[in-house]
């Protein structure tokens, strides 16, 4: 992965806000601490609204995708700006220090982890359960402390590349359209579940989701209609 210079990242964000200020912002894998800090500076300076932070720290394979300096920059710079943070189970463990995947009561562990992560951000915390083997239920901890379990069945599909990225992007789209956080999360989860269930099979290895599954079924492209 070739890192982009932080000055260029910040300039690109400014160029977007100068032209068409976005109604929502999704932040995914940034990679390096300097770039993460540049994103945080630009979003804070611009007063960005509806910021969804997907802390892409640990891949499905278990490999670390960001170094410790980048994680610190994420926690100190981006999480305080987030309206929604969307860690998967491994990322929730890393951010909270709570063991989830080996816990006897996974749901209770997710709730403890969400509470700790909530101390790092003023926004909602969505602990994604898609990497669990039993089901794919997610925990949404809202900013007011309310906890909501969003139930989901595990979809047996080896082509699951980009599920977390798609989910966080769909949440941002819902917020941009004026949906509340819980409604945006529920609609985004339904969209991703449908994209997995569609069973698109492209190329070799873990392929992408079928982002156009609603269109193929004769419906609207939007997940929020």
Predicted regions located by residue number:
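Nucleotide and nucleotide-moiety/phosphate-recognizing core
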Residues: 34-44, 123, 143-147, 182-183
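Active-site-adjacent loop and "lid" segments of alpha/beta metabolic enzymes
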Residues: 1-9, 61-74, 100, 132-142, ...
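Conserved phosphate/ATP/ADP-binding segment of small-molecule kinases
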Residues: 68-147, 156
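Short, small-residue alpha-helix embedded
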Residues: 93-94, 157-181
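Conserved N-terminal subdomain of the carbohydrate kinase-like
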Residues: 1-65
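Charged C-terminal helix
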Residues: 182-225
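Short, well-structured alpha-helical segments that form the helix of a local strand-helix-strand
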Residues: 109-118, 148, 180-195
